UniProtKB/Swiss-Prot annotation:
Residues 122-138 are annotated as: Mediates dimerization. Disulfide bonds: none annotated. It is found in: Host cell membrane. Homodimer. Interacts with host CD247/TCRZ; this interaction induces down-regulation of cell surface TCR/CD3 complexes. SUPFAM superfamilies: Regulatory factor Nef (SSF55671). Residues 15-36 have a biased composition (Basic and acidic residues). GO terms for molecular function: GTP binding. Factor of infectivity and pathogenicity, required for optimal virus replication. Alters numerous pathways of T-lymphocyte function and down-regulates immunity surface molecules in order to evade host defense and increase viral infectivity. Alters the functionality of other immunity cells, like dendritic cells, monocytes/macrophages and NK cells. One of the earliest and most abundantly expressed viral proteins. This is Protein Nef. A motif (PxxP) lies at residues 86-89. Its main location: host cell. Keywords: AIDS, Host cell membrane, Host membrane, Host-virus interaction, Lipoprotein, Membrane, Myristate, Viral immunoevasion, Virulence. Residues 70-79 have a biased composition (Acidic residues).
Length: 225
């Protein structure tokens, strides 16, 4: 029985990766390893280069065992590889759970370099609510512009603006369903954002320290009229 349960959990985890994280070999709309390292050397800057994304994957057959980041909007919303109903009692996100879930997601493929969108935001919320019983509403970030820091202390994934070079804004990335385009639609500042893992966020509550006004009464500052 234990073996069957482990296989079921492993299948659900693969479902999340296929639906949200996609495969590491997948080139469409994801930052390369070299580009991530270049960005990490410039904490205050944005990524200057991207893999050249393609819209071909929209109509091309899916490779066995993998998906394409620019085709996930055509999938069924409910097919995220998780339980239909919460598998555990509902509970609020805590610092320890945020740390654990951040590392869990990193170990299972990570969000690193994946374009952020409201739809992927909801998929992640749904997964953690149904699998871990964590009530949605915890996944909030500072308003921007610039780097968006998580407002939930312990969540180690921030959102970093990504610059798309002018020469790459041609036919390939002009496809409206491409995540490089959709991400900027979801952002009030029109920036294309990608997830970035930052372990230092476990010790430094950047969102609260830099932007206390965004926390309202919790900051101790007088609220605006």
């Amino acid at each position: 029985m234990g073996s069957a349960g482990s296989k079921k959990q492993s299948k659900q985890q693969r479902g999340l990766r296929e639906r949200l994280l996609r495969t590491q070999e997948e080139p469409y709309g994801k930052l390369s390893e070299g580009q991530r390292k270049q960005s990490s050397r410039s904490p205050g800057g944005s990524d200057k280069d991207l893999n050249s994304p393609s819209c071909e994957g929209r109509n091309a057959p899916r490779a066995e065992g993998g998906g394409q980041q620019d085709t996930d909007d055509s999938d069924e919303d409910n097919e995220v590889g998780v339980y239909v109903r919460p598998n555990r009692p509902l509970r609020s996100m805590t610092y320890k759970m945020a740390i654990d879930m951040s590392h869990f997601i990193k170990e299972k493929g990570g969000l690193e370099g994946i374009y952020y969108s409201e739809r992927r935001h909801r998929i992640l919320d749904t997964y953690l609510e149904n699998e871990e019983g964590i009530v949605s509403g915890w996944q909030n970030y500072t308003y921007g512009p610039g780097i968006r820091y998580p407002r939930t202390f312990g969540w180690l994934w921030k959102l970093v603006p990504v610059d798309i070079p002018e020469e790459e804004r041609g036919a390939e990335t002009s496809c409206l369903v491409h995540p490089a385009q959709i991400s900027s639609w979801d952002d009030i500042h029109g920036e294309t954002l990608a997830w970035r893992f930052d372990p230092l966020l476990a010790h430094d509550y950047v969102a609260f320290n830099r932007y206390p006004e965004e926390f309202g009464y919790q900051s101790g500052l007088p609220e605006k009229e």
